[in-house]
Amino acid sequence: MTQLKSQSSAEKQPELLRVHATASRFDPHFHSTYSIVAIKRGSAEIRSARWSGTARAGDVFFFNPFEVHAARCCEDDAEYDTLYPSKAFLVRCLSIDRSDGPLSIRTSLLRKGSATRELVDVLEAPRVEDKVIEVSLRRMLSACVFSTNSAEEGVGALVQRACMLIRRNCTRAMRTEDLAHEMGVHKSHLVRTFSSAVGMAPQTYMRQVRVAKAREFMTEGVPLSEVALMLDFSDQAHFTREFKKVYGMPPGAFSRALGKYRR
């Protein structure tokens, strides 16, 4: 269960969301943005379709948008900072001329060392401006490998198409049967192929895409009651249950920590 201590965002529509938290485990989930995680205390076993390994204090690891991953702390809770940069923020850090194509992080984990030390030290500060973080990120990212190919290119055309259809229809509830019918394949074939490639069943992926979109709306200051309606949750209680499954806390607690909750 995630135990959030603090969370801050510099902009109403943030290019860089920073979260400080402690956690004992995360069930399989994903985020709609890039994730850069710096372990401050403890260690955790990380697992995704792209990589798996143990991250320790001082290490920094990475996930691409919609990359399913899970974590379990080896002993006590782990304390960590997570940066959720937008694509525009990463493009600026990397000084890329074109920003309209895909961009994926190929590096999985950087071990504690000169490449990670500056960023970890910057994140130790109680208050730090985005510009300072950006400078530290730029230096650390120079040690990473990036690709202009899609991070999902290896999952197969069927799964890629299914993922895109789900994301494009994230404002409405969808059944696996409906998705399979729209794609012209049998439900069992879709479930088997999708689950193997992505790391979760399509129905779970659908719910989590809606929850990820809810989180985006919440960082923009959209009231919780409106978020639940916009994303076709049956009611506020349903939204709260699904959000807590993914992030380990109710959406109200997330919004208050973010400082964007409009009463």
Locations of the language-model features?
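An amphipathic alpha-helical interaction segment
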Residues: K87-L94, P102-R168, D178, H189
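Short, conserved glycine- and acidic-residue-centered signature motifs
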Residues: S32, V155, V159, R207
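Residues that scaffold the ATP/ADP-binding catalytic core of kinase and kinase-like folds
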Residues: R47, R92-L94, Y205, V227, ...
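Short hydrophobic/aromatic patch on the recognition helix
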Residues: G58, L190-F194, H238-F239, F243
